[in-house]
């Protein structure tokens, strides 16, 4: 089986996210990572998903609704995630840096907020928690 970036991240998450987990999708995009985190964390878990684009928020909510999954989908920068979770309470943080496929090519993740968000995510992680970071270019 040939793995692309998304499938490699998903395989990593399947190995590290258990039922009941508290997870953050820092870059919701089309919602694929959010949906997987919801399935892995299960009914006893919690998932927060962030994006700065209303289009991405709508796509994520639509996917979750179609799959009957629940997450807190938040229109805000991932750099602000510490406003939504306490330090050392999160099991998993996921970033997919790039831009929304099919979206405005002028809107993409930027170093200024992304570096800040990675630091915020690290502070939110429990000891033993995991962070997945995928980078897309173009």
Feature map (PLM): residue ranges:
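S-adenosyl-L-methionine
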Residues: 1-22, 26, 32-35, 39, 58-91
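Helix-to-beta-strand junctions that scaffold the AdoMet/dcAdoMet cofactor pocket
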Residues: 18, 41-42, 125-127
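Glycine-centered, small-residue-biased loops immediately flanking beta-strands
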Residues: 21, 45, 129
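Conserved SAM-binding motif I beta-strand of class I
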Residues: 46-51
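Mobile active-site "lid"/loop adjacent to the S-adenosyl-L-methionine
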Residues: 94-116
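A short glycine-rich, Lys/Arg-flanked "PGG" loop and its adjoining helix->strand segment in the class I
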Residues: 113-127
